[in-house]
């Protein structure tokens, strides 16, 4: 299982939000590239980056910060936020992004996901962000009448590389992953599922090593890594033993 440290970008800064609220942003680093390099030095091999401003604007808004990250690290970088058309997907992949995450557009334009997955095999993930079980879009500002499982099943035969499931109520709250909902999605589809939202402690990491979580492909951690609740070396060692 891969543990992805998260870098959320807002106005060029590395921040963490609480439940996706842009008014509840805490700046953790003014230099996202330096933060990425620090994660790489700690032993992480893959990075999860979100352009928060882009998620609301519907187009990339933190390109300079992402470019700086790509120039600084060798680790694999997956990127989401404001990726709503093939031209943007192609541009990011051309710059060296390993995998792009399509969120809002996966709900609004499912065919975009299918076209992109066919054109860029292994490079397309779908971000499923759920609020009370239903998918949220446009920076989590709106909720669609579609469940997480229903959305995941739409792409069962599309060749999508991964589904990234985030429980919005837990995101940034350090209350633990929503294991039940994440596993329900993973059992309903044949696409690898990555868990996100609420990872808070080494106990949560240990929970991910349990047999029932073997079907999960990875997990994303943000605030708990920044404030020291999760020791990177211990977390990575636990997952290596898994």
Swiss-Prot record:
GO terms for molecular function: 1-(5-phosphoribosyl)-5-[(5-phosphoribosylamino)methylideneamino]imidazole-4-carboxamide isomerase activity. Keywords: Amino-acid biosynthesis, Cytoplasm, Histidine biosynthesis, Isomerase. InterPro entries: Aldolase_TIM, His_biosynth, HisA_bact_arch, Isoase_HisA-like, Isoase_HisA-like_bact, RibuloseP-bd_barrel. One of its GO terms (cellular component) is cytoplasm. Its EC number is 5.3.1.16. It is found in: Cytoplasm. One of its GO terms (biological process) is L-tryptophan biosynthetic process. It catalyses: 1-(5-phospho-beta-D-ribosyl)-5-[(5-phospho-beta-D-ribosylamino)methylideneamino]imidazole-4-carboxamide = 5-[(5-phospho-1-deoxy-D-ribulos-1-ylimino)methylamino]-1-(5-phospho-beta-D-ribosyl)imidazole-4-carboxamide. Pathway: Amino-acid biosynthesis; L-histidine biosynthesis; L-histidine from 5-phospho-alpha-D-ribose 1-diphosphate: step 4/9. Its main location: cytoplasm. HAMAP family: HisA. Belongs to the HisA/HisF family. PANTHER family: 1-(5-PHOSPHORIBOSYL)-5-[(5-PHOSPHORIBOSYLAMINO)METHYLIDENEAMINO] IMIDAZOLE-4-CARBOXAMIDE ISOMERASE (PTHR43090:SF2). This is 1-(5-phosphoribosyl)-5-[(5-phosphoribosylamino)methylideneamino] imidazole-4-carboxamide isomerase. It comes from Beijerinckia indica subsp. indica (strain ATCC 9039 / DSM 1715 / NCIMB 8712).
């Amino acid at each position: 299982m891969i543990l992805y440290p998260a870098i959320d970008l807002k106005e060029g800064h590395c921040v963490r939000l609480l439940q996706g609220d842009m008014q509840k942003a805490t700046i953790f680093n003014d230099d996202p590239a330096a933060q990425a390099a620090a994660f790489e030095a700690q032993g992480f091999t893959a990075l999860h980056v979100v352009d928060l401003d882009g998620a609301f604007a519907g187009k990339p808004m933190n390109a300079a910060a992402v470019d700086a990250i790509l120039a600084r690290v060798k680790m694999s970088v997956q990127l989401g936020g404001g990726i709503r058309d093939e031209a943007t997907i192609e541009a990011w992949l051309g710059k060296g992004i390993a995998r792009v995450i399509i969120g809002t557009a996966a709900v609004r334009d499912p065919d975009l996901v299918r076209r992109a997955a066919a054109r860029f095999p292994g490079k397309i993930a779908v971000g499923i962000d759920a609020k009370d079980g239903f998918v949220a879009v446009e920076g989590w500002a709106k909720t669609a009448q579609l469940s997480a499982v229903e959305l995941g099943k739409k792409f069962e035969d599309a060749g999508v590389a991964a589904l990234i499931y985030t429980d919005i109520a837990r995101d940034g709250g350090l209350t633990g992953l929503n294991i039940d909902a994440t596993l329900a999605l993973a059992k309903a589809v044949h696409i690898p599922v990555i868990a996100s939202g609420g990872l808070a402690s080494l106990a949560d990491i240990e929970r991910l090593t349990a047999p029932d979580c073997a079907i999960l492909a990875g997990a994303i951690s943000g605030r708990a890594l920044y404030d020291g609740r999760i020791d990177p070396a211990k977390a990575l060692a636990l997952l290596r033993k898994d």
